[in-house]
């Protein structure tokens, strides 16, 4: 089975997951990666468009922005939907600064899935916590300075620090297990 792995990563979290997917899927018998890399800039043309057209399944990784996939990956979905370049199945994976809440992860996946062309089947999804940029911590600290009794801001600062090690070894092991269980080895799903 031919597959493509595309990702968008601001802090490197989602890139780590994409690299793990490339490694794990590359070890699977019967699969061929036709594209691996960041979301292409601009319209899909030429060889890049052909690679997406060849893929039977797309692994699409994103970072979370305001409760949805980031604009880069959403733009790719729109671009693929305008043409016949979209693989028939997709597996979404991503990272979010706020972790340990499966219901939150489910809402993010649901929001991202709503952006997919109707012809595409969401086969599976995976989310884990990821570290955030320093500017996020500074924003939360400003909130606390303005109101030292702000429990929500305190919670956000604590969460920022908890996220610094993610994706960690446990996250990566869970992602590897997810990948292996999502696509059978023999023929990679045929």
UniProtKB/Swiss-Prot annotation:
Matches recorded under Gene3D superfamilies: 3.40.50.360
GO molecular function: FMN binding; oxidoreductase activity, acting on NAD(P)H
Pathway assigned to this chain's UniProt record: Porphyrin-containing compound metabolism; protoheme degradation
SUPFAM superfamilies: Flavoproteins (SSF52218)
Matches recorded under NCBIfam families: flavodox_BilS
Job description of the protein: Together with BilR, catalyzes reduction of mesobilirubin and/or bilirubin to urobilinogen, a key step during heme degradation. BilS is probably involved in electron transfer for the bilirubin reductase BilR.
Protein name as catalogued: Flavodoxin-like domain-containing protein BilS
Annotated source species: Clostridium symbiosum (strain WAL-14163)
